[in-house]
Amino acid sequence: MTELKKTALHLVHEKLGARFTDFGGWDMPLKYSSELDEHHAVRNAVGVFDLSHMGEVRVTGPQAAEFLDHALISKLSAVKVGKAKYSMICTESGGIIDDLITYRLGDNEFLIVPNAGNVDNVVSALQGRTEGFDVEVNNESDATSMIAVQGPKAAQAMLEIVENVVDAPEASGAGETVAEAIEGLGYYAAFSGVAAGQPVLVARTGYTGEDGFELIVANDGAETVWTKAMDQAAQLGGLPCGLACRDTLRLEAGMPLYGNELSLKLTPVDAGLGILAATKSKDSFVGRDAIVSAKEKGTQQVLIGLAGEGRRAARGGYEVFAGDGEKAIGAVTSGALSPTLGHPVALAYVAKSAVSSGAAAEGATVEVDIRGKRFEYKVVALPFYSREK
């Protein structure tokens, strides 16, 4: 059995009494006390997460932008320095290898953040696509940590966590002072600075549906940054948070999870994210022909939101039925009792024909088989939860 990887903060989590779980080959904190308390801390105050299992892949060289236009489905050359883009890397047949965020740090420098379980596949795919491009792909994942500060009071905490602004690209919106940088930093934008004496990349990104920041730091500086982040969070009613609440937070926000809503068997079009593919502005990229074909033919399934009553949550794999029909029209991909809303919510792929006919259209009632008994769920618009802005 392969030994699980540990983040640079593992001992810190042990001292905090964390319960751990295997996630993408990493021994990660599932929760520290109550996942409900942690969830509510992020929704109402601030939560601090160790996301060091996520990958960091640096792409540099005179043709870095052109290379990523070829390797990813979006047009990365159009991203300004200081900004970031959510995109995907696909196979030639259009299957999703991973969904990822790419930061443009310079004219010829990008930082890609893939999901933990897909780092090796992403690096392999990128390196296999470098032929003909003057570019280098370096996997820095094992030397790098990521700490997320998420919630309505995240910006307030960051004012004390960040000490100096080193480089704030104009497109990022960040100003020269810490206050101007935190207040002005746009969503999906980043600047380099100093936090707790450590060089960090500060990004306004997250996976919770709340305002939030992610700090990327070298492993040897991770504990110092974590400690300062936790000190500030505690003063604002915040908590350390594990992956259990991160999952319910992202589910409420209607955000897809690789392995649940996204996979090699699905194209971006299948997942309702065909808009990410720059099929009009790019003549060629890996997977383009397959994605164009999928757009033309249309998908046979649709990702929908489901809201139930009571306390019984639908889980991944549970079948969805049109009313009292005998044949399943789809299956749940993610589901949980929503801590914020107080009722079960779920994401599910269902047949497009069921949506077109009205049987699984927004406002319709479907049934989910939960351990042999059917429960009614209403088809609702996504996201389930949206913060006030």
Curated annotation (Swiss-Prot):
Signal sequence range: none
Q: Which NCBIfam families match?
A: gcvT, PRK00389.1
Question: According to the UniProt entry, what is the EC number of this protein?
Answer: 2.1.2.10
The family database entries (SUPFAM superfamilies) matched by this protein are listed as: Aminomethyltransferase beta-barrel domain, Folate-binding domain
From the Swiss-Prot or TrEMBL record, give the protein name: Aminomethyltransferase
This entry carries the following GO cellular component terms, namely: cytosol; glycine cleavage complex
PANTHER family in the record: AMINOMETHYLTRANSFERASE (PTHR43757), AMINOMETHYLTRANSFERASE, MITOCHONDRIAL (PTHR43757:SF2)
Q: In this UniProt entry, which cysteines form S-S bonds?
A: none
Positions the record marks as coiled coil are: none
Question: What reaction gets catalysed by this protein?
Answer: N(6)-[(R)-S(8)-aminomethyldihydrolipoyl]-L-lysyl-[protein] + (6S)-5,6,7,8-tetrahydrofolate = N(6)-[(R)-dihydrolipoyl]-L-lysyl-[protein] + (6R)-5,10-methylene-5,6,7,8-tetrahydrofolate + NH4(+)
InterPro entries per record: GCS_T, GCS_T_bac, GCST_C, GCV_T_N, GcvT/YgfZ/DmdA, GcvT/YgfZ_C, TrmE/GcvT_dom1
Recorded superkingdom:
Bacteria
For biological process, the GO terms are:
glycine decarboxylation via glycine cleavage system
The record's section on Pfam families has:
GCV_T, GCV_T_C
Enzyme class, broadest EC rank: transferase
Q: What does this protein do?
A: The glycine cleavage system catalyzes the degradation of glycine.
Q: State the oligomer form and interacting partners.
A: The glycine cleavage system is composed of four proteins: P, T, L and H.
Q: Which GO terms describe its molecular function?
A: aminomethyltransferase activity; transaminase activity
Provide the family line. Answer: Belongs to the GcvT family.
Q: Which UniProt keywords apply?
A: Aminotransferase, Transferase
Name its species: Corynebacterium jeikeium (strain K411)
